[in-house]
Amino acid sequence: MRATGRARGARRPLRVVRRPGCPVTRPNRPVHQSIGPTSRLARVDVHPSACAVSIEIAPLAARGRRNTDPAGTPLADSAPLRQPLRSVRAHRFGIRAMTRGRAITRTSNEPSSHAGHASPKPPANHRPGRRPTSTPNRRAPAPPPSATPRETPSGRSSVWCILNRVQTDVNVMKSSRSSKSARAEAAQPEFPRLSLFDAKGKVKTVEAQALRVDFADGRSLMFDLSGSSGDAAVAIVAQHTDPSLRATIALRPEHYDSVTVEAGADENPDFAHDATDDAGEDAPNREPELDLAVQYGDEIGDAQRRSLPKRKVIAEWLEPAIFSDAQFTVRFVGADEGRTLNHSYRHKDYATNVLTFAYGEEPDGVTVADLVLCCPVVEKEAREQGKTLVAHYAHLLVHGALHAQGYDHERGEEDAAEMEALEIDILAKLGFPNPYR
């Protein structure tokens, strides 16, 4: 925002200084304003942690000194810091004096007559309370305090001195301002004053203990202004509304007196661990999942295939019979393939109704098995026992699934009774009658 005027006594914005090896920052940023009554430059000290950072503002250099690094070491190749000059108009003498500390410069075209601190004679066109027309309306550059009077090429004398009467006027102005400063300090609030700027540059000042900046994606930055981190220090904490994400803080230095704070987010390992624990606690109540594949042997023609149970129906029959995640392959074969498999693995030279090839459990707890049903044998048994073909297929599939999970009716009568009772209960849930009656 460009200012068109400035009231007497108002602080002039600090100009940005280009320093070798450092990027040039944008002018008139609030972090570049001088601090304190002596207009010293500020240095930013950063104390980071996991998701928080403490930024402390400290004085860097006094007015008129050479540029220094953050450690306070003077830089040999840098130019003196250009500080804003205090403008004092001495109406009594009709001159405009530019002060840097206590040093002022005379800008009148008249030769200096400061010997004995005598006041110069005002120009002929001077009127009290106005600036003489012969005085250029620009500021003269301020030399170092140790400068001595010298003759300029134009023949004019540019004298650097301290005028008692002008200094008296300055002291009067300072005394009036000091009384206002004393009253302001007496009414100083307990917490820092927060200035908010809108898009048009208008400022609104409030007294606040904390400030939070919320972003659209759930990230936020909390600024602690209570002073608990120390004088002229602000603690900044990054937060995120999503518990699965952990807020982070990234610092990007721009200049010796400014730093950019960026809020980020990454995966929260604690949240992932808690979610895994919750999943483990809920695992017993979770329905087991079935990965089912259906195959047909070479002896099964298209007409017979259409009469066999479909994959969806087979899955509905097997789901109540599995107690953990399972990966089953159901294969319908003819008499020749059924006989070959039974002879190869059980050393029995005939085809049987169902063969179960259990491969045990995988490391992740999934039961893997193949269930082979011989269609001619199943159809023959259904006719002989007076059962429907669908009910008999359902019973044999449940029987083979229990075998795959470790149940065995051939180990003894007790194991056989347990397995039969389980089969009856599962088939009853599916709507089928007791197969052993």
UniProtKB/Swiss-Prot annotation:
Gene3D superfamilies linked to this entry: Metalloproteases ('zincins'), catalytic domain
Chain intervals with Low complexity compositional bias: 131-140
GO cellular component terms, A-Z: cytoplasm
Endoribonuclease YbeY, as annotated region: 173-437
Transmembrane segments: none
Entry keyword annotation includes ATP-binding: no
Gene Ontology terms, MF aspect: metalloendopeptidase activity; RNA endonuclease activity; zinc ion binding
Residue positions binding Zn(2+): H399, H403, H409
Enzyme class: hydrolase
Coiled coil: none
GO biological process: rRNA processing
Domain of life assignment: Bacteria
Protein location: Cytoplasm
Residue ranges of the region described as Unknown: 1-172
Names of required cofactors: Zn(2+)
Comment on bound cofactor: Binds 1 zinc ion.
Pfam family, one: YbeY
EC number from the UniProt entry: 3.1.-.-
Keywords in alphabetical order: Cytoplasm, Endonuclease, Hydrolase, Metal-binding, Nuclease, Ribosome biogenesis, rRNA processing, Zinc
Region (Disordered): 64-158
Function according to Swiss-Prot or TrEMBL: Single strand-specific metallo-endoribonuclease involved in late-stage 70S ribosome quality control and in maturation of the 3' terminus of the 16S rRNA.
Homology family: Belongs to the endoribonuclease YbeY family.
UniProt name for this protein: Endoribonuclease YbeY
Gene coding for it: ybeY
